[in-house]
Amino acid sequence: MIPKLIVFGGNGFLGKRICQEAVTSGYQVVSVSRSGKAPHSNELNDKQWMQEVQWTAADIFKPDSYHELLNNATNVVHSLGILLENENYKQTLSKSPTYDSKSRLLSFGAGPNPLKKSSPYFTYEMMNKQSAIILADTFKQKILKKSKKEQEKANQRSFTYISADKGFPLIPSGYINSKREAEIELEKMQRYFRPIIVRPGFMFDEHRNAIGPRSFIHTALELLYCGNKFLLRNKLQLLNDLIRPTVSTQQVSKSVLKNIENPDFKGVVTLEEILKA
């Protein structure tokens, strides 16, 4: 029987690479997102694996829109979340470098325009925490409908949550706090599935062109990390905690699949462990 992997946020920056790695590993892959569309890509390699994925639309806050997808599901991945409670920041990260985008980058921590109506769901509490809890609870309810014998096979099921290594400078503490709070709730469900908590740092994609604000941040963080490592020899713990290595979405994806396929693993996957994948 071909193993099935359902990725919520599967057309996102990291989610699509998890889908790609899963397809390569022989999984039947279902991507769930609001649009239900495959991500745009001009790369031939991307177009090939994308044809193997079932792209589906659903609202994670409305279990009725996706609960049937969880029938007989053994592995679920939550790859949703926000870094800022500002609905425009993801567009800023993905745009080509311009004076305007760099200016907005410098005011990255600024809140949303108070005159602009925003989604009530676009908060740390809802996107980073509640969306994961709602999905995990829906998965749990499906498991409870199985026979007692099947319910006891928790090690054969997994729920992967993409958390974060640490908070980032200029980013509100609500970001990392919401991630940690979600982790605590998911770990309470070990009776039903293996909670896999993945904690990457700032991510970049190995195959995307090195342009745009995300590339600007990646380069700056790499310079800081190398300076701390080779010039200061990592002697200052305060800097070690603040300046962390970046990690590619491909490395994170390999780590996710590696731990999903290990029936004995549950718990936290640190940034250091991800970098070894």
Curated annotation (Swiss-Prot):
Q: Which GO terms describe its biological process?
A: ubiquinone biosynthetic process
Keyword check for Mitochondrion: yes
The pathway noted for it is: Cofactor biosynthesis; ubiquinone biosynthesis
Q: Could you cite one Gene Ontology molecular function of this protein?
A: protein-containing complex binding
- In a knockout, what does one observe? Shows impaired de novo coenzyme Q biosynthesis.
PANTHER family, sorted: MIOREX COMPLEX COMPONENT 2 (PTHR12126:SF16), NADH-UBIQUINONE OXIDOREDUCTASE 39 KDA SUBUNIT-RELATED (PTHR12126)
Instruction: Give the chief site where it resides.
Output: mitochondrion
User: Into which family does the record put it?
Assistant: Belongs to the NAD(P)-dependent epimerase/dehydratase family.
What miscellaneous comment appears in this entry?
A: Present with 1470 molecules/cell in log phase SD medium.
Highest taxon above the source species: Eukaryota
Q: What does this protein do?
A: Component of MIOREX complexes, large expressome-like assemblies of ribosomes with factors involved in all the steps of post-transcriptional gene expression. Component of a multi-subunit COQ enzyme complex required for coenzyme Q biosynthesis.
Entry's Pfam families?
Epimerase
**Keywords per UniProt:** Mitochondrion, Ubiquinone biosynthesis
Q: Name one GO cellular component term.
A: mitochondrion
Location of the protein in the cell: Mitochondrion
Kindly list the organism's lineage: Eukaryota, Fungi, Dikarya, Ascomycota, Saccharomycotina
Q: What is this protein called?
A: MIOREX complex component 2
Looking up InterPro entries in the UniProt record yields: ComplexI_NDUFA9_subunit, Epimerase_deHydtase, NAD(P)-bd_dom_sf
Q: Which organism is it from?
A: Saccharomyces cerevisiae (strain ATCC 204508 / S288c) (Baker's yeast)
**Could you give the subunit structure recorded for this chain?**
Associates with the mitochondrial ribosome. Component of a multi-subunit COQ enzyme complex.
